Amino acid sequence: SDYIHLGGDEAVIEKNWTQCSRCQAMMKKLGYQKASQLMIPFFSRMLSFVQENIKTPILWCELDNIYPPANDYLFPYPKNVTLVSWRGGLTPTCLELTRKHGNPLIMAPGEYAYLDYPQLKGDFPEFNNWGMPVTTLEKSYQFDPGYGVPAEDQAHITGVMGTLWG
């Protein structure tokens, strides 16, 4: 593949990196106040490595992450990074920000493109449903990747991705 997705959204940074003595030493050396700021040198090194190996890096378009607010350290993203919008409800904001910043965008919003979400209410046992909305295949087929914005404002959308997590 010409693309490599670097992930990063599952890292419990504040819990783990605040308890790591090496991380704390690096924070002090770099003058950082929050453990989440360590993502700056991490992603910088990873992005350089991927590009040196003639691949296109892909990152999640993080705007309002719980651990931590990722927009603190990732916007503006480097322009040669393709982003994936996934977080339910925040895709229109990601669409606008990536247009302004010049990043290519893949659309995969959870409320339309997560194909492993329940098809009917009650499809998943309550102990296994952490708040996934019902997302029928009909709803997925009706998805408008441009969210109704003018064509010139969605020219940076490079595709749609349906996701299945297991």
Task: Please give the residue ranges for each predicted region.
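Substrate-binding groove of N-acetylhexosamine-processing glycoside hydrolases
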Residues: 2-3, 10, 25-166
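Short acidic/His/Gly/Ser-rich catalytic and metal-binding motifs that mark active-site loops
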Residues: 13-22
